[in-house]
């Protein structure tokens, strides 16, 4: 064998060593000791989804679906109601966004729009008339806080309108238990001159009532007059014949007297 053959075998041996080393490296790593247990390879864990992000996405989806539902419902409404609902929905959305923003920032101050809305509601509640009961003192009504002449006139008109309607329920109780005693009680703080003026006013009212009652009474009687009184009737007019026929004139048509005529008159 020549030296060339040695070189050939040496080259092939080197190639075999390279192949063996590559295959050895490709196999599993050698354990440090025979007693060591095999540890399974750790699986690649996928990152857990963020629950907060999912919650925000779900809330946004819910808000979007609710908004779509509102839009579908208001499509059948008129233009004015639709604008009011859209404005209200926009305001609520702004308030919710502001509340979320302030909550995340730790700010507890009230939103300006919410404060303005609350003040408007308070003013509306204050302007709403309170419900009166039997236990409510009547002097607590704003009409009794009058100072000017017009305020007193408004109070008088309101009281007169409210009290006079009680006469329709019971005229007897109205006159005996309410009106007469009320006039006396109201006149107590007045001066003598003011009481005299009140009496004169009542006298004028009394005369007017007498005239009204007389007219009503005469209207029911046929032929009655305001001056002649009720029940008197007008005398019937007699026809004037000019004295041609009188009761005292006597006409004797039953006696035949022909003494004034002679026999020669009929010849």
Swiss-Prot record:
Pfam families: eIF3_subunit. Signal peptide: none annotated. Keywords: Coiled coil, Cytoplasm, Initiation factor, Protein biosynthesis. It is found in: Cytoplasm. Residues 192-220 form a coiled coil. The keyword Cytoplasm applies. One of its GO terms (cellular component) is eukaryotic 48S preinitiation complex. GO terms for molecular function: translation initiation factor activity. The keyword RNA-binding does not apply. Residues 39-66 have a biased composition (Basic and acidic residues). Residues 24-38 have a biased composition (Acidic residues). One of its GO terms (biological process) is maturation of SSU-rRNA from tricistronic rRNA transcript (SSU-rRNA, 5.8S rRNA, LSU-rRNA). It comes from the Eukaryota. Residues 1-70 are annotated as: Disordered. HAMAP family: eIF3j (MF_03009). Belongs to the eIF-3 subunit J family. Component of the eukaryotic translation initiation factor 3 (eIF-3) complex, which is involved in protein synthesis of a specialized repertoire of mRNAs and, together with other initiation factors, stimulates binding of mRNA and methionyl-tRNAi to the 40S ribosome. The eIF-3 complex specifically targets and initiates translation of a subset of mRNAs involved in cell proliferation. Component of the eukaryotic translation initiation factor 3 (eIF-3) complex. This is Eukaryotic translation initiation factor 3 subunit J. It comes from Vanderwaltozyma polyspora (strain ATCC 22028 / DSM 70294 / BCRC 21397 / CBS 2163 / NBRC 10782 / NRRL Y-8283 / UCD 57-17). The gene is HCR1.
């Amino acid at each position: 064998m020549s030296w060339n053959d040695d070189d050939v075998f040496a080259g092939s041996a080197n190639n075999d060593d390279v192949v063996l080393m590559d295959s050895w490296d490709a196999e599993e790593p050698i354990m440090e000791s025979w007693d060591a247990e095999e540890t399974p390879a750790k699986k690649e864990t996928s990152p857990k989804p963020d629950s907060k992000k999912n919650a925000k996405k779900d809330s946004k989806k819910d808000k979007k679906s609710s908004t779509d539902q509102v839009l579908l419902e208001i499509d059948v409404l008129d233009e004015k109601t639709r604008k009011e609902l859209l404005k209200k929905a926009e305001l609520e959305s702004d308030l919710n966004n502001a509340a979320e923003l302030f909550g995340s920032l730790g700010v507890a101050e009230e939103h300006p729009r919410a404060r303005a809305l609350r003040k408007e509601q308070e003013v509306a509640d204050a302007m709403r008339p309170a419900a009166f009961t039997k236990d409510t003192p009547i002097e607590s009504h704003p009409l009794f806080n009058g100072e000017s002449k017009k305020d007193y006139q408004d109070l008088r008109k309101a009281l007169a309108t409210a009290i006079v309607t009680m006469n329709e329920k019971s005229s007897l109780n109205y006159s005996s238990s309410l009106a007469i005693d009320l006039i006396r009680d109201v006149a107590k703080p007045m001066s003598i001159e003011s009481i005299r003026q009140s009496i004169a006013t009542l006298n004028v009212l009394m005369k007017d009532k007498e005239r009204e009652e007389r007219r009503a009474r005469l209207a029911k009687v046929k032929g009655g007059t305001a001056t002649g009184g009720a029940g008197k009737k007008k005398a019937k007019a007699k026809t004037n014949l000019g004295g041609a026929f009188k009761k005292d004139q006597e006409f004797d048509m039953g006696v035949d007297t022909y003494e004034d005529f002679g026999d020669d008159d009929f010849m």
